[in-house]
């Protein structure tokens, strides 16, 4: 590693961590309807939205009403996007006259963007019109992220409130998350990207003749606005086929820094938002410490692995300081690895290098980040409510070890809460192991892999892990655009999204109804290094140990077979 690499890492952590406490407090004030510096500008817009939609902002909902509103909104978003994708060829703003998508691909794409996964079995510039990108994909990028933030806020209220029957109003939370939480930051990032050379235009594709005399089509489009929310909303779906490796999505080292930092900017800030809800920022610091520890463990492993020369190329007497196959030279190895670890720590899934070309252990780090349930920062809202589930599981385990009824911040965890927690632990195994096993056992679907042996298994394992974790990245050698995989990965994405959201909202309702006992000397502290260590081990053992046999068949076997 060179001095530039260390400066990149320093700048990345500075951009992410320094504004997090301020931004976290801002989100708390916004979601609770308190006045902020944006209120004079966006307040009238917010109130206008309520009047137009007939929403009573003062009427709160219980957890069942909140859940039904969320499900209805997401179903409507899915149906609208599904229709737009099917009818794309007949709609305006389609200068390339691209046809509508085949039904299974349209189903997969609509589910993908509705669940904040952004798994793409297609290439954007060759399959999706400008109108579809804007009113279909970009809109879902906003509202899927806002949905995750709303669920987190509902859980935070459930933990913080005492003897309460309501969690807030989903429509209000959705509106505030979009207007105040996402739009202003996206505007700033989009302008920065345009400054760096990312296109934002409705012009037709450019047809050019190269110096060699061959014809070339250069795709354009309203890219900067979508890329901004793709990153800040932890969505990840690329405007162009190769995502942020494309020079029009990510043209410079500066744009690379802005984009990779923006992936986890909001998730980190929301940890402090939770601290404001429970009136104890020590809880935020403990959770941040655990997240950073997991991130640094995975990042260090990936950096070490990816800077090792590939034995296969060494035997061919190819000189290499670090493997650059599948990477962009303008980002280098460290910039590519940083993005890989960040995008899989969050439920983002965008890439600036080809994950299929990573050394086996680097690819394994990316998979493990997702297999843990995207709790290392995670998606907007989704990452923290996933982490809070592990916090409650760690508290439950601590209670078992010391023989006390487990409690978190004065709320006792009883049979109903533990049942809901256990239900969430089944989400990743069902999506990855069961659906993945079905795909691997059938000769047709298994033929989607492009490599034999361990790496081919890793391609399939990565696909179903990414879908269930609502990440969206892929080993690009996997041929996902088949009816079987479009439907099965679509189901995995639905399981991964709503398999968490439904128990989380039920848990929030259960906790909100409980009385809160004052914490005394006998209470187990959840803000110190002891609990942080317990939480870290709980995540690794309870969340990760399930997948060790499959990892042994994939990236670990490949690593050993290559002779690293």
UniProtKB/Swiss-Prot annotation:
A molecular function GO annotation: P-type potassium transmembrane transporter activity
Membrane topology, from the record: Multi-pass membrane protein
GO terms under cellular component: plasma membrane
InterPro entries cross-referenced by the UniProt entry: KdpA
Localization, UniProt: Cell inner membrane
Transmembrane domains' residue ranges: 4-24, 67-87, 135-155, 179-199, 258-278, 286-306, 382-402, 420-440, 487-507, 534-554
Keywords: Cell inner membrane, Cell membrane, Ion transport, Membrane, Potassium, Potassium transport, Transmembrane, Transmembrane helix, Transport
Subunit note: The system is composed of three essential subunits: KdpA, KdpB and KdpC.
HAMAP family: KdpA
Similarity remark: Belongs to the KdpA family.
Task performed by this protein: Part of the high-affinity ATP-driven potassium transport (or Kdp) system, which catalyzes the hydrolysis of ATP coupled with the electrogenic transport of potassium into the cytoplasm. This subunit binds the periplasmic potassium ions and delivers the ions to the membrane domain of KdpB through an intramembrane tunnel.
Protein name per its UniProtKB record: Potassium-transporting ATPase potassium-binding subunit
Organism: Pseudomonas entomophila (strain L48)
Gene field: kdpA
């Amino acid at each position: 590693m060179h001095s530039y690499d260390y400066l990149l890492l320093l700048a990345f952590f500075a951009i992410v961590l320094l504004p997090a406490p301020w931004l976290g407090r801002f989100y708390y004030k916004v979601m609770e309807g308190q006045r902020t510096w944006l209120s004079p500008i966006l307040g009238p817009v917010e109130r206008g939205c309520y009047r137009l939609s007939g929403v009573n902002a003062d009427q709160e909902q219980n957890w069942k009403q909140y859940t039904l509103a969320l499900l209805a909104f997401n179903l409507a978003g899915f149906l609208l996007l599904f229709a737009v994708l099917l009818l794309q060829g007949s709609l305006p703003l389609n200068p390339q006259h691209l046809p509508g998508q085949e039904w299974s691909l349209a189903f997969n794409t609509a589910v993908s963007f509705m669940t904040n996964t952004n798994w793409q079995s297609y290439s954007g510039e060759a399959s999706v019109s400008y109108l579809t990108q804007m009113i279909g994909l970009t809109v879902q990028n906003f509202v899927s992220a806002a949905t995750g933030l709303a669920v987190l806020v509902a859980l935070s209220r459930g933990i913080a409130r005492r003897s309460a029957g309501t969690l807030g109003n989903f429509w209000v939370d959705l509106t505030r998350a979009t207007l105040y939480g996402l739009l202003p930051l996206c505007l700033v990032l989009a302008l920065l990207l345009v400054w760096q050379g990312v296109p934002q235009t409705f012009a037709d594709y450019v047809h050019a003749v190269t110096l060699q005399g061959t014809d070339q089509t250069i795709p354009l489009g309203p890219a900067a606005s979508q890329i901004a929310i793709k990153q800040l909303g932890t969505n990840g779906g690329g405007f162009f086929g190769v995502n942020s490796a494309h020079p029009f999505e990510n043209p410079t080292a500066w744009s690379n820094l802005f984009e990779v930092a923006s992936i986890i900017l909001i998730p980190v800030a929301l940890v402090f938002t939770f601290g404001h809800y429970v009136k104890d920022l020590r809880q935020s610091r403990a959770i941040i410490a655990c997240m950073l520890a997991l991130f640094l463990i995975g990042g260090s492993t990936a950096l070490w692995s990816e800077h090792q020369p590939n034995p296969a190329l060494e035997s061919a007497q190819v000189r290499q300081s670090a493997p650059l196959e599948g990477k962009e030279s303008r980002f280098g190895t460290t910039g590519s690895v940083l993005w890989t670890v960040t995008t899989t720590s969050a439920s983002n899934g965008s890439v600036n290098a080809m994950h299929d070309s990573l050394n086996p252990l680097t690819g394994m780090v990316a998979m493990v980040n997702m297999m843990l349930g995207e709790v290392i920062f995670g998606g907007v809202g989704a990452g923290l409510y996933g982490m809070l589930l592990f916090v409650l599981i760690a508290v439950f385990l601590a209670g078992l070890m010391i023989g006390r009824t487990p409690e978190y911040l004065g709320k006792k965890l009883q049979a109903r809460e533990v049942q809901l927690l256990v239900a969430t632990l089944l989400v990743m195994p069902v999506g990855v192991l069961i659906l993945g096993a079905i795909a691997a056992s059938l000769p047709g679907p298994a033929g989607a892999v492009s490599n034999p042996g361990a790496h081919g298994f890793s391609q399939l394992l990565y696909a179903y892990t990414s879908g269930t974790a609502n990440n969206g990245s892929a080993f690009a050698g996997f041929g996902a655009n088949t009816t079987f995989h479009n439907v099965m990965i679509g189901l995995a994405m639905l399981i991964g999204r709503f398999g968490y959201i439904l128990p989380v909202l039920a848990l929030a309702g259960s906790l909100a109804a409980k009385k809160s006992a004052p914490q005394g000397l006998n209470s187990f502290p959840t803000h110190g290094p002891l609990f942080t260590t317990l939480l870290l081990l709980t995540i690794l053992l309870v969340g990760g140990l399930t997948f060790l046999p499959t990892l042994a068949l994939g990236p670990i076997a490949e690593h050993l077979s290559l002779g690293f």
